[in-house]
């Protein structure tokens, strides 16, 4: 378990209709170390989690129990961000997606920010490294993102089979950096494989909602419900 300073609140949309549902959700999450408190709003189908646990761990645990979940906000206002990580190789978008990972980011103290990094669909197994580059210009892939601004020490072990294709690989890690959120917005988040063959994916770090800042059920832009948008996201490998 991490230090108390690493605890943060996150809200999730989870289908629920009664106390039997919330009891089942509690049972699903019971075995996860690091959860301090769970709160439920059945009328809004929202769950609040105070923990030091990666959001991907919460979501995957619920999916293993047959329940879907969408993270709706994390941390205090202006303390969260996200980066959708894409490959810059040629991809037939009619059959595939360029998305190969996701970084969910939340600041937990003045000089500590947590990064929940998921990689899914890389062609080579092994250790991948994460780093932040100085700018968010991904027009030419990683080579146009500028100098390395911060490099994480902990690798991401990508040795699990990807659910995109059995010949591809996936991995996850929960890492931290002594950087505030405001200093990350607009920069690029890069995952790369050292050695040969080399491989990298990247995305621009963008601000996301803090806890209880996003409780909409229908998107004003598309008219789709959050669950319809969730299906679209899953099709595009955003999990």
Curated annotation (Swiss-Prot):
Q: Is Metal-binding given among the entry's keywords?
A: yes
What species is this protein from?
Candida glabrata (strain ATCC 2001 / BCRC 20586 / JCM 3761 / NBRC 0622 / NRRL Y-65 / CBS 138) (Yeast)
Question: What SUPFAM superfamilies is this protein classified in?
Answer: Cu,Zn superoxide dismutase-like, HMA, heavy metal-associated domain
Domain HMA intervals: 7-70
> What does the entry comment about cofactor binding?
Binds 2 copper ions per subunit.
Give the required cofactors.
Cu(2+)
What GO cellular component term, any one, is given? cytosol
Instruction: State the encoding gene.
Output: CCS1
User: Which residues hold Cu cation 2?
Assistant: 219, 221
Binding residue positions for Zn(2+): 163
The identity of this protein, by name, is Superoxide dismutase 1 copper chaperone
Its family remark reads: Belongs to the CCS1 family.
Record flagged with keyword Chaperone: yes
UniProt cross-references to Pfam families, sorted A to Z:
HMA
């Amino acid at each position: 378990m991490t230090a108390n300073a690493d605890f943060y609140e996150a809200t999730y949309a989870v289908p629920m209709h009664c106390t039997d549902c919330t009891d089942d959700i509690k049972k699903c999450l019971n075995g996860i170390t690091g959860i301090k408190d769970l709160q439920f709003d059945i009328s809004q189908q929202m769950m609040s989690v105070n923990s030091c646990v990666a959001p991907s761990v919460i979501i995957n645990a619920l999916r293993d129990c047959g329940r879907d979940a969408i993270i709706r906000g994390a941390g205090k206002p202006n303390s969260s961000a996200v980066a959708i990580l894409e490959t810059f190789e040629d991809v037939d978008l009619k059959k595939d997606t360029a998305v190969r990972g996701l970084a969910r980011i939340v600041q937990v103290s003045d000089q500590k920010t947590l990064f929940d990094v998921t990689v899914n669909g890389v062609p080579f197994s092994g250790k991948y490294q994460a780093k932040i580059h100085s700018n968010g210009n991904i027009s030419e892939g990683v080579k146009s993102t500028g100098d390395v601004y911060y490099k994480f020490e902990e690798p991401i072990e990508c040795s699990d089979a990807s659910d995109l294709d059995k010949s591809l690989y996936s991995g996850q890690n929960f890492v931290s950096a002594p950087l505030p959120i405001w200093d990350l917005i607009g920069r690029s988040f890069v995952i790369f494989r050292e050695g040969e063959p080399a491989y990298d994916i990247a995305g621009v770090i963008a601000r996301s909602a803090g806890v209880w800042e996003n409780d909409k059920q229908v998107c004003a832009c598309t008219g789709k419900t959050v669950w319809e948008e969730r299906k679209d996201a899953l099709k595009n490998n955003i999990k």
